[in-house]
Amino acid sequence: MPNRSTCSLVALAAFATLTGQAAAQQQLNIYNWSDYIDPTIIEDFTKETGIRVVYDTYDSNEILETRMLAGGSGYDIVVPSAEYLARQIQAGVYQKLDPSKLTNLGNMWPMIQERVAAFDPDNAYSVNYMWGTTGIGYNTAKVAEALPNAPLDSWALVFDPQYAEKLASCGIDMLDSPGEIIPAALNYLGVNPDAASAEDIQKATDLLLKVRPFIRKFHSSEYINALANGDICVAVGFSGDIFQAR
């Protein structure tokens, strides 16, 4: 599975405290990605603390950001991807963390903290929750049937129209996440995936428009079951999701 694995390309999520009222009210309101926590952990937490957890989920950073920037979300903890942190911090939707109350900070992986610090200087508003890669998962049998000698070790599999067109017959799904897809497209074009100029973003846009007719759906969770059930043969997604589909 070709993947993005450098600092700017790692899909990170970070906890961020929003209010200080939850403990007093004996209720903690959490907004997280779907399938990102074992439900038994929530049950165990409530048994140990007596604090009730209200747990809601979303499928894209854009949904989370829209809700956060609108204000008054009511959530105490949310889990944005790292590249969205800076804009949200600047908008004032988070409170600073009190490191003295976070007794497990010493267990954080320094390398990942440094990467997140590019978006959250000094890790003042967030702590690492999860990291992984974004890449391509595929059904080997279906891909071999639709495209013999497919370039399975290359992003050309989904970004080259001559390949994408043939794979459209068995189905391609792609993450509904510009923060993941655009850097991948830039990298495929030989451009710095961190590039942010209008010219470079347009290059990625033009590439994506060429293969857009061959993409069945843009979504950030449905591709898991679709790939597992054989409804599609290729999925651009998060590594954990691809592993789950396998």
Task: Enumerate the predicted regions with their spans.
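Bacterial N-terminal signal peptides that target proteins for export
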Residues: 1-9
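Bacterial N-terminal signal peptides
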Residues: 8-17
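Sec/Tat signal peptide C-region and signal peptidase I cleavage site
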Residues: 18-24
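Early extracytoplasmic/lumenal segment of secretory-pathway proteins
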Residues: 25-88, 225
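A ligand-binding cleft/hinge motif common to bilobed small-molecule-binding domains
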Residues: 84-87, 234-246
